Swiss-Prot record:
Main location: plastid
Protein name: Palmitoyl-[acyl-carrier-protein] 4-desaturase 3, chloroplastic
UniProt-listed InterPro entries: FADS-2_CS, Fatty_acid_desaturase-2, Ferritin-like_SF, RNR-like
Catalytic activity: hexadecanoyl-[ACP] + 2 reduced [2Fe-2S]-[ferredoxin] + O2 + 2 H(+) = (4Z)-hexadecenoyl-[ACP] + 2 oxidized [2Fe-2S]-[ferredoxin] + 2 H2O
Length: 398
């Protein structure tokens, strides 16, 4: 998934009233477990020196916030998921594989194919490679995303080979996603334009750091997160495909395009899950939607680190924003799409808290667009450059 989302300023209205407390029409949350780090916020340099820890402090982590009766909903939906979610998977024998889009190492013309690929890549600017490498690194952290899905109560793979529809989906989705990082990694390696060792270090750091999507082991929150992220990923890869085409590399455009197509198909599955939850449990679902948007959808790679730059994700996101690969406008567009896709404005019979949550998500898009306008204005005044280790410390504009 590059499961991707932009870093956004903390400028959204507070929705703390959507969390905790009793709710009519929606079961109260289970007593959450709050996990606090023993490292002070701001001690970035000290944290970065410690092995196998994120490059900076993360916030409080809440776990197991879903009441037991809500977990039963997901168990009751296993048959529905078999009929409605697993259909969005492709049989392995009908799936594309990375080798379909790469030079054939068994062919006599292999070296000529590689030379042609490298020649095409020379026409592509460094800032594009920063965006593409960031996407690839995000895809390569797939073990973290499977782990995240298996933290969700009621849908996790309890044995590692469970035959429940939720577990089958998670494993098969992971298997499909695994091709994305493989393909981009090999393609970038063959270009000769990037520092593969620095990229590989970044991947190892990222998988070791994990991710903190703030989904609380709660599948309501988790599937809203994945619905948003899969659409964001499809947009991002679609835009890198468009840029590659503009630069004259039609093969790379095809690579990015086929990945975007996969992400779009996965998005359909996740949005369908939330659609079903809105049908059977609208109050809890709209509360979860507002909760995730209040917390802001963070990119799974927000703990990205290359051993040098503590703010690597922020810098990578700035390049992606400037290039139009993924922007604050896209973030707002995705939210607008999901509000319409799930008919959130039309929900009725909600509790008072549910109506507040409904109003929050339905009026949030214009506020995000204002944030985008300010960000665009700041970008025009910018001119800051940054050296990226991924491209042999060459400078690009942020």
């Amino acid at each position: 998934m590059a499961l991707r989302s932009l870093f956004l300023p903390n400028a959204f209205p507070n929705a703390s009233s959507f969390r905790g407390g009793s709710r009519r029409g929606a079961a109260p949350r289970a007593m959450p477990i709050v996990m606090k780090s023993n490292v002070e916020v701001g001690a970035r340099n000290e944290i970065a020196k410690k092995p196998f820890t994120p490059p900076f402090e993360i916030h409080e982590q809440i776990t197991h916030s879903l009441p037991p009766e809500k977990i039963e909903i997901f168990k009751s939906l296993e048959g529905w998921a078999t009929d409605n979610i697993l259909i969005h998977l492709r049989p392995v024998e009908k799936s594309w594989q990375p080798q379909d889009y790469l030079p054939d190492p068994s062919a006599e013309s292999f070296h000529d194919q590689v030379k042609e690929l490298r020649q095409r890549s020379k026409e592509i600017p460094d800032d594009y490679f920063v965006a593409l490498v960031g996407d690839m690194i995000t895809e390569e952290a797939l073990p973290t995303y499977q782990t995240m899905l298996n933290t969700l109560d009621g849908v996790r793979d309890e044995t590692g080979a469970s035959l429940t529809s939720w577990a089958v989906w998670t494993r098969a989705w992971t298997a499909e996603e695994n091709r994305h990082g493989d393909l981009l990694n090999k393609y970038l390696y063959l270009t000769g334009r990037v520092d593969m060792r620095q990229i590989e270090k970044t991947i190892q750091y990222l998988i070791g750091s994990g991710m903190d999507p703030r989904t609380e082991n709660n599948p309501y929150l988790g599937f809203i997160y994945t619905s948003f992220q899969e659409r964001a990923t499809s947009i991002s890869h679609g835009n890198t495909a468009r840029h590659a085409k503009d630069y004259g590399d039609l093969s790379l455009a095809q690579v990015c395009g086929i990945i975007a197509s996969d992400e779009k198909r996965h998005e359909k599955a996740y949005t369908k899950i939330i659609e079903k939850l809105f049908e059977i449990d609208p109050d809890a679902t709209v509360l979860a939607f507002a909760d995730m948007m209040k917390k802001k959808i963070s990119m799974p790679a927000h703990l990205m680190y290359d051993g040098r730059d503590d703010n690597l994700f922020k810098h990578f996101s700035s390049v992606a924003q400037r290039l139009g690969v993924y922007t604050a406008k896209d973030y707002a567009d995705i939210l607008e799409f999901l509000v319409e896709r799930w008919n959130v404005e039309e929900l009725t019979g909600l509790s008072s808290e549910g109506r507040k949550a409904q109003d929050y998500v339905c009026t949030l898009v214009p506020r995000i667009r204002k944030v985008d306008e300010r960000a665009q204005g700041m970008a025009k005044k910018g001119g800051q450059t940054m050296r990226f280790s991924w491209i042999h410390d060459r400078e690009v504009m942020l």
